[in-house]
Amino acid sequence: LGLLYLAEQDFEEGLGALKQAVTYFPKNPQTAPLTRRMTKAFHDIFVGGAAADMTPLNALGLYDRFRELTPVGKSGDQIIESLADRLVEVDLLDRAALLLQRQVRFRVKGAEKARVGARLALINLLNRRPPEALAALDASVAPGLGAGLAAARNRLRARAMFEMGDANSALVQINRDKSRDADELRADIHWRTQSWAQAAPVFERLVGKLGTDGRSLDDEAALLILNWVVSASMSEDRRSLAKARQRYGKSMRATPYGEAFELMTGDSNDDPLDFLSLSRRFEEIGRVKSFLTSYREKLKVGPLGATTTQ
């Protein structure tokens, strides 16, 4: 009966019937091979693609009911992490965190534990729970990590510190990290603490050579350039404003931020309060396009924490 249900894609009834059979008849000669078949069916549902056709909640419900069938080793870990990714995509962050928390506690060790712990920390940050993010990192410390994974964990720890109100410690945590991800985090910290003189050079690094190849600026590039000139304006960094105007004066006119760019980089004697008003106007936009959002974007093209696997 269980196999018939499975053949009809009724996975819950099928696995339920097979579970009853092996539970009620533990000494039957068919129990051992049937148990292996049940475990394989569970694996195939979640790895072979059938679970992808379910809603994330239905997939989670099926997993929770038959969790004991999760294979040991990498295939089982793959099931858990894939399900967690799907839950994150629909903002079921608490449920995703619980899955990975169990994985950290009971399934993985060493560098793999550190990697999954970083994923768990990221979910907690996305869920606005920085203390839990720090706890996840502390619970998954392991020696001998690769440089990429160690740096990613460091950035997550810095983000959690900042979200808990300790901007200085967060900046110290990443002071040796020269990566773009670290600069995005620095820019966000300086922006939100209104440390304009410190923000401007970081945004300038992030802007880099955008638009110098003759291509038009997309909205994201234009916003990054605007954040640079807002920071430079608020810190009265005329050198940076002149550089930005010379480099991007023409190309920024064709973007939604052209008027703001013109005000920030122009030679007029506008009231400084206009600059402050504009900076506040774009503050929330600047924050959205920052550290955590870059991770959310990566969910669309790969598994959660893809940047923490090195």
Model-derived features with residue positions:
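Acidic, polar-rich low-complexity tracts and alpha-helical solenoid repeat scaffolds
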Residues: 1-310
